Amino acid sequence: MEKATQPRAFYGSFFHAPAYGSFEYLERALIEVGEDGAIERVIAHDDPDQAAALAKAREAGTLYELGEGRFGLPGFVDIHIHSPQWPQAALALDEPLYRWLDERTFPLESKFADVDFAKKVYSDLVDQLLARGSTTAMYLGRAHLEATVALAEICAERGQRALVGKTVMDDPAANPDYYRDASPAQAVRDTETLIREVEAIGRKSRAGAWPVITPRFIPSCTDEVLRGLGNLAESTGAYVQTHCNEGQWEHDVVLERFGKTDPYALRDFGLLREHSIMAHCPYLTEEEGEMFAELGVAVAHCPTANSYFSSAVAPVQRFRSQGIHVGLGTDISGGYSPSMYENIRQAVLVSRLLETGVNAQLPPEERGGLGEGTRLSLVESFWLATAGGAEALGLPLATFEPGRAFDLQVIDVKRPDSDLTGFGVFDEPIDRLARILYLSTPDNVRQVFSQGVLVCDKDAR
């Protein structure tokens, strides 16, 4: 698709959330995009320059018009995905975590030693994510180097911006013999190789690709490998991702092993730093949160997966008030859906439960709710899925502002089987946005652009 002539001016009505807690509706705006896929200018409909700019783009054949009944949203930024778990999405989520891992996840992930199998799965996963508007994705590949490099190549070929890590899990006492790193030294060497190869892919990728240092989580790793990965993070400045304070079991294991909690252990191994993305974190204390903010550590909030396997809700509003960067993750396949729309909805839902508590057999004051100021609004959740994820990654994207990468999903609200028009009732911009975020199906997402290039076109099918 990149070889075809690409639009350089996009005319229509757009929603975005450039600031936490608010959104902007850019009605009949013209967005001009440079050859590099970055936004150059946003011209409002009442700007006297718009008519001339529209005419110029139309004459040059570079104008794209969204059309009636269509709206533009920024591409989503999904900052926590287990790429090899895609074949088990939606499976065994009613089982305990240990059974889900031992009987499903580890046997499945071990199959990715077969690179042909890995490419088949990863190609479908990336296509499915793009079809749902996710133009940026942060992946945990698995313990196989070649398959993980192949994932980065597939993302680059399809136009998805990707941050890719080879998961490290080397402790013989904690991981199955058939699926673990051969040694701490080999795990670090493989991660060094991954960094070189993904950086090379990124230099050729229009949207970009970045390597990520990825210990699975502390219980699966030896001290030696955690120390080695921390040193590698220091020397390379690469992104870091892992699970942190995900559940009570993890918390207890780390505390018994080190005499300190998960965040402090990760810090002492050199794995908490700017561009570290910590997934889940519902058990993060206020003191630990202050440390995150001071170090520039970000949280990947995974509301669906937390409900299944953390038995807790992350206090996102507290994180934000402490100055912690927070984005949103689907957490395939601890989260069943590849859709960020679903996780936007779930983030709002679980925050309401955190606000009030859930045991109706107890008096309200004893239900464990955190009270007023805990709930997320839909607009705040939309921000988490777009600008919040971009902020967590430190990348200029996910809003319609000059200098930002132009990532666009075109939403058709008049699809025959998914009509979001609302019959002309409650038709303010916030109502239109709410219908899009709550009711959209993949069929409503008609076209997706990444870095200014068309990467998904359902209208052409």
Regions found by a protein language model. Give the residues of each.
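Metal-coordinating catalytic core of metallo-dependent amide/deamination hydrolases
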Residues: 146, 151-282, 287
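Glycine-centered positions in the ABC transporter ATPase nucleotide-binding domain
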Residues: 13, 36-37, 69, 448, ...
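N-terminal metal-binding scaffold of metallo-dependent hydrolase/deaminase domains
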Residues: 1-61
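Alpha-helical scaffold segments that flank or form the walls of functional sites
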Residues: 70, 89-160, 190-205
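C-terminal cap of metal-dependent C-N hydrolases
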Residues: 19, 405-460
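Active-site gating loops and adjacent loop-to-helix segments of metal-dependent hydrolytic enzymes
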Residues: 87-120, 171-185, 248-273, 298, ...
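His/Asp/Glu-enriched, well-ordered alpha-helical/loop segment
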Residues: 268-275, 317-420
